[in-house]
Amino acid sequence: MVIISGASSGIGRAILSRISNSETKAAVFNLSRTPPEGVPNSLNFTHLTCDLSQPADIANVVSELRKLMPSEGRMLLVNNSGFGAYGEFPAPGVDHTLKMIDVNVRAPVELTGRLWEELKTRGGQVANVASLAGFQPTPLMTTYAATKSFLLDWSVALDAEAKRHGIRCVAICPGPVSTNFSKAAGFASSTGLGGQTADECADEAVRGMAAARPVVVTGWKHKILAVFSARLPKPWAAAIGLRMIQRLRLDRFVKKA
């Protein structure tokens, strides 16, 4: 059984495509506000509408999952949904920032926690889509980077803790990817910083999940950056990050109020 949040677009949709191409007979569930397009009829697929920023929606969708899930078989939970924001804190607004924390942090923790007993009984894997931004503090994307840092550390610690239960946890850490992220982050158009396509990222992610690697950084340039960033003192990393982002002049892509 496969459960993916946010498989309607971006990396989640690309991962769903790879599952479709594998000709798996496993039941596949998508949790998001809108269903993905073009899912082959051969796939045992169910879309469950869910706003992951709403705890009540998560509780309801887990109850629905328990009614629909097959009685046996290993479970793969892919916590993919998430979005970001660009600008000096608290831009673009406190409510937007709190919603980001709910979707990027609370939703993965709640989904995983509510399905934990099923995972322990069945065995399987939890894959959390974090980010290269999780390796260092990132000015002008402060809260987004912090949510991804949480996902990265939480996932690695959970993997160490859960192995004895037959559960593996994988943190997938893409760098810039050509998805709808720019629009959700408040940009009027693409920033042109997409270092990988969603398909390229998904290919590496799926290979890393199959190998149960605790941390999967996609893209060789991003792997180098992750190692470099992790070794720097955090104040240095933040100062260098601020200078680099300012030089990119991302403000020119931001939607005008």
Describe each PLM feature range.
Residues 80-85:
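Conserved NAD(P)H cofactor-binding loop of Rossmann-fold oxidoreductase domains
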Residues 88-101:
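Substrate-binding pocket helix/loop in short-chain dehydrogenase/reductase
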Residues 42-56:
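Rossmann-fold cofactor-recognition segment
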Residues 8, 16:
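N-terminal Rossmann NAD(P)H-binding glycine-rich loop of SDR-like oxidoreductase domains
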Residues 131:
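Residue(s) in the substrate-gating loop at a strand-loop-helix junction
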Residues 112, 147:
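Active-site helix of classical SDR
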Residues 171, 189-226:
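C-terminal helical subdomain
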